[in-house]
Amino acid sequence: MGISANLFVNQKGTTTALKQPKEIGYYSRNQTEEYLVSDDINLRYYYLPDQEIEHGIDLSAGASKFRDVAKDFKDRCSLKGLLDTLMEYEKKKNKKSNVDIITFRGIMSKLIRASMEPPNFNKVDLRIVSYDGQLFIKDVSDYNAATNESNSSGVNSRQQAGTSRQQIDTYTGYKFEGIATLDKPLPYVEREVIEKRPRKILNNGDEYITVVRTGVGECKVVLGAEIDCIFDFKEEGKDNLKHYTELKCSSQISTTNDVRRFEKKMFRAWLQCFLVGVPRVIYGFRDDQYMLKTVEEFSTEEIPVIIKANNPTLGQSCLDAIKWYGLFTDWLLKIIPREQSGNIRAYRLVYENNHLRLSEIEEQDGEYSRYVLEDGILTPEFKEWRESLRVPSEETPKAD
């Protein structure tokens, strides 16, 4: 019988030791589902002068023309770009990276938030494969259940019922990114391009993803994370985490309830940025008519202080999140065997009621072939690369 285990989310961890995030690579994904390693073609640059806001920016403009290309992707949660980037990094060093877990920031964020959000609000439906001494984790949630972490819930402009208010609320996030960024540094952009930003048709297919090595406690992690833009400039050939920025859009704050809702949004934004070392969040605030009214910048490291000053209970959640991060990663590493071999074992990890439930996918299971024998998570190229590192030699290189 396969492995099965539960982790109750009310447990409290003690680990607060964190590893400094370090960028080890990046890639771009385009509208045709291509993954371009070490290509920053989809990296954006922040530029939104005050006078543009004063002239009035309608964040709902163009919602009916939004191109929801991600819904047609063959595998929109694919690890291919992440694995290809990790493989390129390892080839430069000619050795396997010394890490325990490889996944996306959004998945790690979901798992952390499971300790403070119910499963109907935070759907966790993951598949894990244990291979070559490491765990590779993929989100297999339905498209409509995607969280706002990845900005991939989409706005389907093709629905016959038209564009709902909820869809427009989602769209304003894309719109804010569209009007606040450029595809090149400002000196290389023509004035005409800047002026046409409000009329640009947007899509959810183009992304720029950083690949970061980080960790908590004894667990070493590689995370892929979508980056909204560069705040100032990019340093070629260097770690650019300090230059990256998260962009968010929210309704204006008028009531006490608005304050509480925004504090929860800030916590999630902090968690996103904290996990991969993004140092700032820029919020655009809209009124009830979706007009952009103000823009405010927050330092990631100051957000817990801001939250705690207004809401001590929620402020404690930042520290609790780190402790839970350490607890559940340690649990995964202890429960799931990690053989230093080419053997693959697959598992389900779901969030039910008050616990995370892990169960092994056995040979008679309908998903076994996809995740163990085929490329449901691991690509043939990545497995071939790792197999090449196991070819006997006079001296086996140490892991990075």
Curated annotation (Swiss-Prot):
Q: What are the annotated GO cellular component locations? A: Las1 complex; RNA polymerase II termination complex
Which EC number(s) are documented for this chain?
3.6.1.-
The record's top EC class is hydrolase
Q: Has keyword Plastid?
A: no
Q: Where does a divalent metal cation bind?
A: E177, D228, E246, L247
Recorded catalytic reaction(s): these are:
a 5'-end NAD(+)-phospho-ribonucleoside in mRNA + H2O = a 5'-end phospho-ribonucleoside in mRNA + NAD(+) + H(+); a 5'-end (N(7)-methyl 5'-triphosphoguanosine)-ribonucleoside-ribonucleotide in mRNA + H2O = a (N(7)-methyl 5'-triphosphoguanosine)-nucleoside + a 5'-end phospho-ribonucleoside in mRNA + H(+); a 5'-end triphospho-ribonucleoside in mRNA + H2O = a 5'-end phospho-ribonucleoside in mRNA + diphosphate + H(+)
> What's any GO biological process attached to this entry?
nuclear polyadenylation-dependent rRNA catabolic process
Summarize subunit and interaction data from the UniProt record for this chain: Interacts with RAT1; the interaction is direct, stabilizes RAT1 protein structure and stimulates its exoribonuclease activity. The interaction also stimulates RAI1 pyrophosphohydrolase activity, probably by recruiting it to mRNA substrates.
Function text: Decapping enzyme for NAD-capped RNAs: specifically hydrolyzes the nicotinamide adenine dinucleotide (NAD) cap from a subset of RNAs by removing the entire NAD moiety from the 5'-end of an NAD-capped RNA. The NAD-cap is present at the 5'-end of some RNAs and snoRNAs. In contrast to the canonical 5'-end N7 methylguanosine (m7G) cap, the NAD cap promotes mRNA decay. Also acts as a non-canonical decapping enzyme that removes the entire cap structure of m7G capped or incompletely capped RNAs.
The family note in this entry says: Belongs to the DXO/Dom3Z family.
Could you identify this protein by its name? Decapping nuclease RAI1
Q: Look up and give the organism this protein is from.
A: Candida glabrata (strain ATCC 2001 / BCRC 20586 / JCM 3761 / NBRC 0622 / NRRL Y-65 / CBS 138)
